[in-house]
Design a protein with these regions (language model features):
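N-terminal accessory segment detector
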Residues: 1-120, 138-150, 157-158
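ATP phosphate-binding glycine-rich loop and adjacent ATP-lid/helix-beta elements
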Residues: 119-128
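Low-complexity, intrinsically disordered Gly/Pro/Thr-rich segments
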Residues: 127-143
Length: 158
């Protein structure tokens, strides 16, 4: 598998695998509350990652186009040779991933024999949320569509 994907992609798989594994271990020991704690932790981690991406790209603003730029800094190297598909309308950013583009969450779900929704809702989407909040703390994330073939994420700011 690693021959097929970039080092950046594989780093994403490793990070998500570790987070999902710990989340499941804590859930087994402490119950469903552990899932909420893990989601909150992943949002915080996404915010820290977003701050690093902002610094790397020299992004200082807090607008929707700034969030879009940070997402490109984050995801373009991961999904290369593909590019992140984004669309901005007003204060709404739509991010779309379509097959043949693969994301690390799909690989993690397959490797761990988990529903994609579990990996995305607990880890991947929380990273999206945290990274958006690094640019604008009032950013709101929602997942419109989630499947192996197509995912649509929406970020809105007031």
């Amino acid at each position: 598998m690693s021959e097929k994907f970039s080092p950046e992609f594989m780093a994403g798989v490793q990070l998500m695998s570790a987070l999902m594994g710990m989340t499941l271990a804590f859930k087994k020991r402490f119950g469903d509350e552990a899932m909420k704690v893990a989601q909150g932790f992943t949002v915080q981690m996404g915010t820290m990652m977003g701050n690093k991406f902002k610094e790397k790209a020299g992004i200082k603003g807090s607008g929707i186009h700034d969030i879009e730029r940070v997402y490109h800094v984050w995801l373009d190297p991961i999904i290369a040779p593909h590019k992140l598909k984004t669309n901005v309308e007003g204060n709404k950013l739509t991010v779309t991933r379509e097959s043949p583009t693969v994301c690390p969450a799909i690989i993690v779900a397959k490797q761990m024999n988990l529903p994609l929704e579990m990996v995305c809702n607990n880890i991947s989407m929380r990273m999206f949320e945290g990274i958006a909040k690094s640019v604008n703390p009032n950013a709101k994330h929602s997942s419109v569509q989630m499947s192996e073939h197509k995912c649509i994420e929406v970020i809105k700011i007031p």
